[in-house]
Amino acid sequence: MVRYKATISYDGTLFSGFQRQRHLRTVQEEIEKTLYKLNNGTKIIIHGAGRTDAGVHAYGQVIHFDLPQEQEVEKLRFALDTQTPEDIDVVNIEKVADDFHCRYQKHLKTYEFLVDNGRPKNPMMRHYTTHYPYTLNIKLMQEAINGLVGTHDFTGFTAAGTSVQNKVRTITKATVSRDEKTDFLVFTFSGNGFLYKQVRNMVGTLLKIGNGQMPVEQVKVILSSKNRQLAGPTISGNGLYLKEICYEN
């Protein structure tokens, strides 16, 4: 067997997330169906570095899979790209070592979250931004977001029901700015891993702080208390993008 690593992008609007689910349309299912056709009915399982939720988009999701025989990478990329649905793009494919694993190999993930703060909202971007029509103080959010940088137990920012025991993660970058062209707010988070709905919960909390409903110190209170009830709401996922995954070496 020969192992391949692929970088893919997708519009998450019509997907029920990345991971295969029974009777639902997912990114994993669509790619595996295409690989099945390309490999003469041989079942191919793909593994994803991140399990994006329903409606969440990706510019730089990474997957890996094993094929029975070695193939020329550009021909493989072209075939997979042209035969998957139009809301999936296969950006790059490369051959990797047999022990490479896209999820467990040490890496840095970057997520981006777009918020349409306009009144009225931009209807053309309703699937690609999350609308928040209330007054926001960006300076308060910029001050608060700095408290997320570093190594912390993010229990207070994860969704209930997660099976992950160790909730300590390291965030190396956390910023919020306003895009001058679109006027959207852009939240950016880079780190060694993120818990279930962590980014959406962090953005929901920062918006409450920007709106004056929570103090700037609330981020530190949530981290120290590990109490999900003290954080903001889980904001809808249509503004969330898996931007990039960078592997060591």
Swiss-Prot record:
Superkingdom classification of source: Bacteria
Pfam families for this protein: PseudoU_synth_1 (PF01416)
Presence of keyword RNA-binding: no
Positions that bind substrate: Y111
Molecular function GO terms recorded: RNA binding; tRNA pseudouridine(38-40) synthase activity
Keyword Chaperone attributed: no
EC nos: 5.4.99.12
Catalytic machinery residues: D53
GO biological process, one term: tRNA pseudouridine synthesis
Catalytic activity: uridine(38/39/40) in tRNA = pseudouridine(38/39/40) in tRNA
InterPro entries cross-referenced by the UniProt entry: PsdUridine_synth_cat_dom_sf (IPR020103), PsdUridine_synth_TruA (IPR001406), PsdUridine_synth_TruA_a/b_dom (IPR020097), PsdUridine_synth_TruA_C (IPR020095), TruA/RsuA/RluB/E/F_N (IPR020094)
Keyword tags: Isomerase, tRNA processing
Gene3D superfamilies referenced in this protein's UniProt entry, alphabetically: Pseudouridine synthase I, catalytic domain, C-terminal subdomain, Pseudouridine synthase I, catalytic domain, N-terminal subdomain
Similarity section: Belongs to the tRNA pseudouridine synthase TruA family.
Function: Formation of pseudouridine at positions 38, 39 and 40 in the anticodon stem and loop of transfer RNAs.
Subunit structure, as described in the record: Homodimer.
PANTHER family in the record: PSEUDOURIDYLATE SYNTHASE, TRNA PSEUDOURIDINE SYNTHASE-LIKE 1
Protein name (database record): tRNA pseudouridine synthase A
Lineage: Bacteria, Bacillati, Bacillota, Bacilli, Lactobacillales
Gene name linked to the record: truA
